[in-house]
């Protein structure tokens, strides 16, 4: 399962760990992903999405029906 938010598209990015001596070693910054069940009133069922914390805020703001319509338009399965 890839580490990508289904709502926002956030994915891991790369950067450096910097020690006190400023040595640089590569690292990954991972998105804050959670599998979360959302109740879709129009379909009378639960939908499980892998979303970041920001994705949950987007769903709270726009509504689950609007977000699912955007996912369908992109051709994503949920």
UniProtKB/Swiss-Prot annotation:
Keywords: Ribonucleoprotein, Ribosomal protein, RNA-binding, rRNA-binding
One GO CC annotation: cytoplasm
MF terms (GO), sorted A to Z: rRNA binding; structural constituent of ribosome
Coiled coil: none
Keyword Ribonucleoprotein attached: yes
Keyword Ribosomal protein found: yes
NCBIfam families, per database record: L28 (TIGR00009)
PANTHER family in alphabetical order: 39S RIBOSOMAL PROTEIN L28, MITOCHONDRIAL, LARGE RIBOSOMAL SUBUNIT PROTEIN BL28M
Family, as annotated: Belongs to the bacterial ribosomal protein bL28 family.
Name this polypeptide is given: Large ribosomal subunit protein bL28
The species this protein was found in: Escherichia coli (strain K12)
Upper lineage: Bacteria, Pseudomonadati, Pseudomonadota, Gammaproteobacteria, Enterobacterales
């Amino acid at each position: 399962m890839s580490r990508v938010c289904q709502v926002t598209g956030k994915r891991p990015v790369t950067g450096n760990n910097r020690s006190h001596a400023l040595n640089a070693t590569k690292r990954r910054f991972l998105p804050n992903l959670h599998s979360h069940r959302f109740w879709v009133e129009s379909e009378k069922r639960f939908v499980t999405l892998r979303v970041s914390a920001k994705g949950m805020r987007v769903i709270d703001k726009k509504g689950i029906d609007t977000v699912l319509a955007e996912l369908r338009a992109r051709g994503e399965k949920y």
